[in-house]
Curated annotation (Swiss-Prot):
One Gene Ontology biological process: keto-3-deoxy-D-manno-octulosonic acid biosynthetic process
UniProt-listed PANTHER family: PHOSPHO-2-DEHYDRO-3-DEOXYHEPTONATE ALDOLASE (PTHR21057)
One annotated GO molecular function: 3-deoxy-8-phosphooctulonate synthase activity
Its EC number(s): 2.5.1.55
InterPro entries hit by this protein: Aldolase_TIM, DAHP1/KDSA, KDO8P_synthase
Pfam families: DAHP_synth_1
Pathway in which the depicted protein is active: Carbohydrate biosynthesis; 3-deoxy-D-manno-octulosonate biosynthesis; 3-deoxy-D-manno-octulosonate from D-ribulose 5-phosphate: step 2/3; Bacterial outer membrane biogenesis; lipopolysaccharide biosynthesis
Identification of the protein by name: 2-dehydro-3-deoxyphosphooctonate aldolase
Organism placement in taxonomy: Bacteria, Pseudomonadati, Pseudomonadota, Gammaproteobacteria, Enterobacterales
Family that this chain belongs to: Belongs to the KdsA family.
Length: 284
């Protein structure tokens, strides 16, 4: 199978290279908390030798409730990201929700993310593509893995070939998600070998059909992440928090940050083992 390499500065992401970590917090809750969380991730990933990109949202524009916390907004968010980059020398990924935000965000961060709910919005895709930034495409829960090829084609037609794909599960009936482990290879194939990242945090989400906030299955994060890493992928997407019960968004799915190092040790061991095996051509 062909493996494309996407360069995030000096970090190389590919399905046959050591895995890259996209990790941080769901949404920027405060400057100080972002600094604490980023410092912890940087310390652990440097210790373990894992290439790392800090993740947070400056605006959660798709919250279920009008009363839910959204974030500090574009201007303050970019200030915080700039400070994190200066303080820790870290790469940053964040999501873009409107075409008019794309260039302003790409001027600051290293990877811009296309949200799952917006992944078929052509105007947004084209605006993001024109920035020339590395793109992380969240596969929508409501499309099959094979359909991501159409999204990748839009970016390429707009002149951007630096595309990473990210799976966060698929709808399984109402208010539930499952992860199709066979889908990772389908995404690789239909994209011509794009790096595939597994967003284990959001794959753990559950919904109360009458509630305003997401639930989660944090207790199953290790099992699900181990299964995904065993397929052989380019990276893992994991959010952590020092106090998940009081996180302002998706706390029930967040990894307690004190568990980050032992968690990543397991992921690194699986990744190294799987990628030490030769690829077997078993036909089509």
């Amino acid at each position: 199978m062909k493996h494309l390499v996407v360069n995030i500065g000096d970090i190389q992401a590919a399905n046959d290279l050591p895995f890259v970590l996209f990790g941080g917090m769901n949404v920027l809750e405060s400057r100080d908390l972002a600094m604490r969380i980023c410092e912890h991730y940087v310390t652990v990933t440097e210790k373990l030798g894992i290439p790392y990109v800090f993740k947070a949202s400056f605006d959660k524009a798709n919250r279920s409730s009008i009363h839910s916390y959204r974030g500090p907004g574009l201007d303050e968010g970019m200030k915080i990201f700039s400070e994190l980059k200066a303080q820790f020398g870290v790469k940053v990924i964040t999501d873009v929700h409107e075409a008019g935000q794309a260039q302003s965000v790409a001027d600051v961060v290293d990877v811009i993310q296309l949200p799952a709910f917006l992944a078929r919005q052509t105007d947004l895709v084209e605006a993001m593509a024109r920035t020339g930034a590395v793109i992380n495409v969240k596969k929508p829960q409501f499309i099959s893995p094979g359909q991501v090829g159409n999204i990748v084609d839009k970016f390429r037609e707009a002149g951007n070939h630096q595309v990473i794909l990210c799976d966060r599960g698929s709808n399984f009936g109402y208010d539930n998600l499952v992860v199709d482990m066979l889908g990772f290879n389908v995404m690789k194939q239909v994209s011509g070998g794009c790096p595939v990242i597994f967003d284990v945090t959001h794959a753990l989400q559950t919904r109360d059909p009458f509630g305003a906030a997401s639930g989660g299955r944090r207790a199953q994060v290790s099992e699900l992440a181990r299964a995904g890493m065993a397929v052989g992928i380019a990276g893992l997407f994991i959010e952590a928090h020092p106090d998940p019960a009081n996180a302002k968004c998706d706390g029930p799915s967040a990894l307690p940050i004190a568990k980050l190092e032992p968690f990543l040790r397991q992921m690194k061991a699986i990744d190294e083992l799987v990628k030490s095996f030769p690829e077997l051509d078993t036909g089509h």
